[in-house]
Swiss-Prot record:
Signal peptide: none annotated. The keyword Transferase applies. One of its GO terms (cellular component) is cytosol. Pathway: Lipid metabolism; fatty acid biosynthesis. InterPro entries: 3-oxoacyl-ACP_synth-2, Beta-ketoacyl_synthase, Ketoacyl_synth_AS, Ketoacyl_synth_C, Ketoacyl_synth_N, PKS_Beta-ketoAc_synthase_dom, Thiolase-like. The active site is at C158, H297, H334. Keywords: Acyltransferase, Fatty acid biosynthesis, Fatty acid metabolism, Lipid biosynthesis, Lipid metabolism, Transferase. One of its GO terms (biological process) is fatty acid biosynthetic process. This is 3-oxoacyl-[acyl-carrier-protein] synthase 2. It catalyses: a fatty acyl-[ACP] + malonyl-[ACP] + H(+) = a 3-oxoacyl-[ACP] + holo-[ACP] + CO2; (9Z)-hexadecenoyl-[ACP] + malonyl-[ACP] + H(+) = 3-oxo-(11Z)-octadecenoyl-[ACP] + holo-[ACP] + CO2. It comes from Staphylococcus aureus.
Length: 403
């Protein structure tokens, strides 16, 4: 069960603000301020707003962490506080951390490479490697909170956050931990990341903040980068009940598959994603007709969105006609490894509050993407089961089912 949540996103620096803004259809995408984008064909991203790390972490400590790790610590602290989870010498061994990042310390790499080229190897920081590696979000969060249980990191590109939560879910289900602090974090608004994703033609080159990220719409031309972190505290029902914890929702199913097809393009007809959705429903012991809401991967790429729609139709059959399918990336942008964490929060809160966040910028529907995408305005709906999809470069497909 999910007992705590923490978020940093382009539409809010905590869960409450992020969820309220998602339901209002707030657009978190704007001109990039972090770097000078004049040399690039991409000028928009979903950046954090009015966020100062020194409000949360000592300046000296923060300088020894890449942004992706800083974000994870802030969101993890919020989640643990929200869960009222007491991590002490009696409980620490049974509380683990499993937080992923898709690309790790990209900014750290850029800075160190410049130092190496300009001033030689002796000027590279001894903190370079510990700041760079993607597992360091988990490492630093476990140190910060004192959690000594199962500890690791999953890296599956854009599926990272969802895979991380799925793996943590299985750790708790097996009885290897009473609680896990889990999710995803990412800080990709850097020169190398923007240049690299631009070179692979994955990013939108549209400079209009209202139309750059428009999942399932005609004219979509790529995703818009976002940054932040989404962290959950999940624990066994017994553990939550024993301490009288507030329960948001239950994770009941997890499916993960590989396309074995192409490094960036999805398999034809969304075959791999379809199998992951089916695996998650099988794990939950439910059928397509049982699911009311699906938080789609929906990144606003021409091929990706269409393939996901085909995968949903192939998996759900007739039930797809009655399924609500929204892409919250229309508001947040694509947070890469963090996106599964944020979207798990949206999925759980949609169940708790009986509300679905919309797909904004839905003004020119693609006739081939003919699902109910909850256009432009939030909707009220009693939800028994919600699903969240994440599909990553490398052919990674991860799906969670919430109750």
């Amino acid at each position: 069960v999910i007992t705590g949540m923490g978020a940093l996103s382009p539409i809010g620096n905590d869960v409450k603000t992020t969820w309220e803004n998602a339901l209002k259809g707030v657009n978190g995408i704007d001109k990039i301020t972090r770097i000078d984008t004049e040399p690039y064909s991409v000028h928009l991203a979903g950046e954090l707003k009015n966020f100062n790390i020194e409000d949360h972490i000592d300046k000296k400590e923060a300088r020894r962490m890449d942004r992706f790790t800083q974000y994870a610590i802030v969101a993890a602290r919020e989640a643990v506080k929200d869960a009222q989870l007491d991590i002490n010498e009696n409980t620490a061994d049974r509380i683990g951390v499993w937080i992923g990042s898709g690309i790790g310390g990209m900014e750290t790499f850029e800075i160190a490479h410049k130092q190496l080229m300009d001033k030689g190897p002796r000027r590279v920081s001894p903190f370079f490697v510990p700041m760079l590696i993607p597992d360091m979000a988990t490492g630093q969060v476990s140190i910060d909170l004192g959690a000594k249980g199962p500890n690791g990191a999953t890296v599956t590109a854009c599926a990272t956050g969802t895979n991380s939560i799925g793996e943590a879910f299985k750790i708790v289900q097996r009885g290897d931990a009473d609680a896990m602090i889990t999710g995803g974090t990412e800080a990709p608004i850097t020169h190398m990341a923007i240049a690299g994703f631009s070179a692979s033609r994955a990013l939108s080159t549209n400079d209009d903040i209202e139309t750059a990220c428009r999942p399932f719409q005609e004219g979509r031309d790529g995703f818009v980068m976002g940054e932040g972190a989404g962290i959950l505290v999940i624990e066994s029902l017994e553990s939550a009940q024993a301490r009288g914890a507030n329960i948001y929702a239950e994770i009941v199913g997890y499916g993960t598959t590989g396309d074995a097809y192409h490094i960036t393009a999805p398999a034809p007809e969304g075959e791999g994603g379809s199998r992951a959705m089916q695996a998650a429903m099988d794990d939950a012991g439910i059928e397509p007709k049982d699911v009311q809401y699906l938080n789609a991967h929906g990144t606003s790429t021409p091929v990706g969105d269409l393939n996901e729609v085909k995968a949903i139709k192939n998996t759900f059959g007739e039930a797809a006609k009655h399924l609500k399918v929204s892409s919250t990336k229309s508001m947040t942008g694509h947070l890469l490894g963090a996106t599964g964490g944020i979207e798990a929060i949206f999925s759980a809160l949609s169940i708790k509050d009986s509300k679905i966040a919309p797909t904004i910028h839905a003004v020119t529907p693609d006739p081939e993407c003919d699902l109910d995408i909850v256009p432009n305005e939030a909707q009220d709906l009693d939800i028994t089961y919600a699903m969240s999809n994440s599909l990553g470069f490398g052919g990674h497909n991860a799906v969670l089912v919430f109750k």
